[in-house]
């Protein structure tokens, strides 16, 4: 299973090579955004299948970035690892800020998926040459502002900024705060984070520059090269120096745009003023981002169905099943083959008479699993559980029968009926199962109604396909 660790500045040198070659053209696929907005995104990371996998936690919900490929990266295998992680952890699978050109393949990958694409999420993408030159009639306004700025400040010059302790930067932030008129908490937070990002100049991950006029900085900018895109994280200019803003935009693009076809000036944060400003610079494209909320076939079920076989009935669990179900769940000798120790989930909580039944009955409303009570003449003798989705039309299935009813084929009968229902009524593409190699009875049961699908040191694996 994937194991994540927190994404912090300390991990920047390890992660920057992924972002340096990432050509998704979106600002979220940059180290700077992850660091600058870490208190909102809460990003954690891991590496698998030659890819960087980012798990964000936004407003209490886990969402995953599209995998970022390394030199030998396999996006499909990385997605499969994310799917398995969510299935094992009983988490919803949500892929956020997916590049638009990746969305179509993901829609085909997932049988049940909701796709969301909102205008405010889009990044503003500009041809580097356009911003570096401001050529043609369409940019006459920007050129006029720059010409006025240079007439007012004939000594104005662009300078590279590499020292986080540069006293000119300290003076600029003091001047900027004195003129800062926005009162919203997000704007104030962004300003504080911008200053913090400049403290990372000596890492070599970012490029930065400023416009000098009369010996002091009147505009600054900081960006990051990601593939063929220069992602501009920060642009600030003093309001008192008209024309400083387009001047820094042009000079920065000319200085640092080499090797980059695109400049990403990020989204507009739903701010009308920002949107107006970004549109005035005539973006060549809007970088679309798609959110995919992946569901499962359980989403279409309104209730746990009832199934009938020659001897058995499979139904939802009932309150009257409590004692028999407790006995089934507390049978340690048999449940070692179940692969789950209830004590792990129980933790420090007391074991009550209703614990097992309540836990099982909570699975279906959350669409985590379908728990079937296996009944012989109405009496609960075991259960079949359809659980752990792979989000691609497959579920795992397990079965356990009380010891006093073992040896009569009830497990095989119940398991086969549930698998057939899952494939032909629920509409799954596959049902998989596994058993410990020492569990010969389960191996025989699974072999009778499924086909072998490999083994490892611990398990035999089986599957049944439509």
Residue map of PLM features:
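A short beta-loop-alpha structural element at the N-terminal edge
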Residues: 2-14, 137, 157-171, 313-327
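Conserved acetyl-CoA pyrophosphate-binding loop and the N-cap/start of the following alpha-helix
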Residues: 74-81, 240-251, 405, 409-418
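Conserved active-site alpha-helix within GNAT-family acetyltransferase domains
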Residues: 102-116, 269-286, 412, 437-453
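Conserved GNAT acetyl-CoA-binding A-motif
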Residues: 89-99, 258-266, 425-434
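Aromatic (often tryptophan-rich) hydrophobic motifs at membrane interfaces
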Residues: 206-293, 407
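Conserved donor-binding loop and adjoining core beta-sheet/short helix segment
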Residues: 28-101, 212-241, 386-392
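Acyl-donor (CoA/ACP) binding surface of acyl/acetyltransferases
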Residues: 14, 226, 263, 295-336, ...
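Acyltransferase donor/substrate-recognition loop-hinge adjacent to the catalytic core
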Residues: 111-183
